[in-house]
Regions:
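Short Pro-Cys-Gly-centered "Cys-loop" motif that presents a nucleophilic cysteine in a tight turn
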Residues: 1-14, 18-53, 57, 66-210
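Glycine/serine-rich anion-binding loops at beta->alpha junctions
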Residues: 60
Length: 210
């Protein structure tokens, strides 16, 4: 399926993902993940982007974020990945691209955001890296469940009501919505109902065919 021009809308949550070049690992050790999040949080604040969920896997990253400007999302990942690539290549005495092209993203309506939050946080469980939902350090899941962590999250309650996060993570996922989320993120198209798609078309000036 062809990849559309990226659509970014200010004030709308987006699912964002990006892989290492040729699916190579982008993190070797905990220090690397610390450094990545240091850069990410610095530029998240600079470009005024809300952070709802995140997960760092060995060769890719996932986020649910909300930019305050159309340019803010691209700037956040441009500068985060530029600074992190410089750090990682210097450490490895390597050169070349660390990340695979541009990031993929999809604006989310409330139903798709509800699924995207746990889709992002449950990545390590699906990959078989952990056996308990609270056992992975490098995602927003642990902070949600324990209230402890240095990477501050924005409240999701403007869009979704989740009172018991652990119970929410254990709910059966809506596979149809997840399928849509994956497909629309890969092709940079919005994930939502007809009303939401029309809203994004109006905001972006783009037309989407499904």
């Amino acid at each position: 399926m062809p990849r559309d021009a990226r659509v970014v809308c200010a004030g709308v949550p987006h699912h964002v993902t990006q892989r290492g070049n040729y699916r190579q690992d982008i993190f070797d050790e905990e220090e690397d993940r610390e450094k990545y999040m240091e850069f990410f949080m610095k530029y998240r604040e600079k470009f005024n982007v809300k952070l709802y969920a995140w997960c760092l896997m060995s060769n890719h990253v996932h986020f649910v974020v909300e930019p305050s400007t159309e340019k803010g999302l691209a700037d956040l990942f441009k500068f985060t990945h530029m600074r992190y690539s410089m750090y990682f290549n210097r450490k490895k005495r390597a050169s070349g691209h660390l990340f695979q092209g541009r990031f993929y993203s999809s604006p989310l309506d409330a139903d798709h955001m509800y699924e995207a939050l746990r889709y992002v946080e449950l990545n390590p469980l699906r990959a078989g890296i952990i056996s308990r939902v609270d056992a992975y350090k490098w995602s927003s899941m642990k902070m949600r469940l324990t209230g402890k962590g240095k990477y501050a999250l924005s409240s999701v309650h403007e869009y979704v009501e989740i009172d018991d996060w652990k119970a929410y993570l254990k709910e059966k996922c809506d596979e149809e919505i997840l399928k849509t989320l994956r497909e629309r993120t890969r092709t940079n198209r919005p994930s939502g109902d007809v009303k939401f798609i029309k809203k994004i078309e109006k905001l972006s000036g783009q037309t989407f065919n499904f």
